[in-house]
From Swiss-Prot:
InterPro entries named among the record's database cross-references: FAD-dep_OxRdtase (IPR006076), FAD/NAD-bd_sf (IPR036188), MnmC-like_methylTransf (IPR008471), SAM-dependent_MTases_sf (IPR029063), tRNA_MAMT_biosynth_bifunc_MnmC (IPR023032), tRNA_S-uridine_synth_MnmC_C (IPR017610)
Annotated region (tRNA (mnm(5)s(2)U34)-methyltransferase), positions in chain: 1-223
Region feature FAD-dependent cmnm(5)s(2)U34 oxidoreductase, mapped onto this chain: 247-643
Gene Ontology cellular-component annotations: cytoplasm
Entry-linked Pfam families: DAO, Methyltransf_30
Matches recorded under SUPFAM superfamilies: FAD-linked reductases, C-terminal domain (SSF54373), FAD/NAD(P)-binding domain (SSF51905)
Organism: Burkholderia orbicola (strain MC0-3)
Intracellular or extracellular location(s): Cytoplasm
Family: In the N-terminal section; belongs to the methyltransferase superfamily. tRNA (mnm(5)s(2)U34)-methyltransferase family.
Single Gene Ontology MF annotation: flavin adenine dinucleotide binding
Protein name (record): tRNA 5-methylaminomethyl-2-thiouridine biosynthesis bifunctional protein MnmC
Amino acid sequence: MPDRLVSATLALRDDGTLVSPEFGELHRGASGTLARAHRTFVAGNGLPARWQRRRTFTIVTTAFGAGAGFLAAWAAWRDDPARCERLHVVAVEPHPFSRDDLHRAVSHMVADTTISADVDALLDAWPMRVPGLHRLEFDAGRVVLTLAFGDTIDLLKKLVARADAFFLDGAAASSDGIRALAKLAGEHATFATHAKSDDVKHALGETGFTFREVDDRLVGDYAPRWRARRHEPPRALPVTTRRAIVIGAGLAGCAVVERLAARGWDVTLIERHERIASEASGNPAGVFHPLMTRDDNVASRLTRGGFLHALARWRALERAGHAFSRSTHGMLHLAESADDFARMRDAFDAFGAPSDYATLLDADAARAHLNLPVAQGGLLFPHGGAVWPAGLCAAQYAAAGERVRLLASTCVARLERRDDTWHALDDTGATLADAPVVVLANAGDAARLAGLRHVALQPVRGQLTLLPPGTTAPLPCPAIGDGYAVPLDDGTLLIGATFEPDDTDPAMRAAGHAENLDRVRHLLPGLIGALPDPATLRGRVAFRWVVGDRLPLIGPLADETQATANARALGGAQARDLPRMPGLYGAFGFGSRGLVWAALGAELIASQLEGEPWPLERELADAVDPARFLIRALRARRVGSAG
């Protein structure tokens, strides 16, 4: 059973003071809260001097509250002409405010009009109150706030980041919290806190922090006298030039291109077809929604993270003038049986989802929502829906601007690494492009190019069907269940899709159309009137590539040759113990969830390259690590001398 997220609340006293049971009295006025946050946390960590002339600087704040620490750091960063290029703030919060209550709290505490635009931007970007990590970008992506909603200590243990400064407050000012922070601390990381108890001082000293009292606060830095960590926090990949090759111009590849270009990388995008988004990403539409399970398992948490991150990135693209077609009326996931609806209800009740994330509809409510007969109710996702994948790819490509160069109608025969540089070669051995970094986003061909023996990709044929305008009842929003139905802008209804593992036939089949018609008739009995002749229908065939656990493969690729040679020593390896091929990354195996995985996967790879905080908890990043199958083989002693 997942831990339900409990939001903070606000109450107004008779004297006009706002009080939160979670945060206590909220002090009024700019001369109070914001100034105290600056003095305690910003100045207490030696800022702004310590971030000056650096590429990135990362702050971990252990209690976001109403955002005073973040707003103070942002204001100091903006006012500093020698500021770092990119400021990351990772903020843990077990009890997030609603957007309305956050507005009330910040307005009550902070009357400084010089940051009113910052406050408005924070409120506009404030995420849904669901557990996990939420990445928000401000100032054209130069200020990044990663909100971690959930239990403070649990999340601190799961974060992946190299912290330069800690704003230590709340539950983290404890032995367990400080031990978790020590695992995140980079060289010479500093901290500042109001907590000065003997227990806090003991925990700081025990984990390698020095400390001293300055007025009413405790400050210090991370300076361990011994090596106490098995794994160091992540670093940026050492490269002499910020150039990358991305192979594959579908949803995965275009998302990576946009994220790298936004960080100042020059990218060569190689696509074997004449244009981008030519394979599964060329479908007329794709459905987009998270999963919900009673135990909030890895797949549920990953799809939630991907769903919310994609929404944020898409809105940013649209605000930047790179619009694309997507539905805006939500999506209804209908149960396939009474037992299936009971499972949906159990998952919904266990999770405690806010209404802007999901709403449970019984059969009558679902029927009223669709204005069509249905056998069961289901889950309504107000921000789910359908997206035109090719339009999204084009928007991401356009956002990359002059930093991307497309090599279309170009096939990569093999990769070679020479002198710290990867070379993409054609079948004659000629170099198509070279760069210190390569990202394989080419679905079924990725394992071949990387020489991965422990990744078994499987093709799945999917045929979709297009029903002409006027042949179906109106459908107000996409609906899914056993199959899906998506209304397109021109009145066409898209239905599908077949699921045919290991079938690589690209030809359209009347039998596939018949299967899709039969499936949607059971999903929505009143949607289609007289059945058309399947042989007369239009459609499209595309291939999705999956692995056995149906999760994507995202991240640095393992050096399987070196791992095999050291198989015995790696029998109990974690993902962080494996040797990797320097500068070689993957984003493939997305199956039918490319719209959910692509944006988050691209952000993860870009963060790994740059040594930035990851947008996923360690457990979830390990779950999509392309080396996970190698790790399982090593543990089972099925590799090399261990076999």
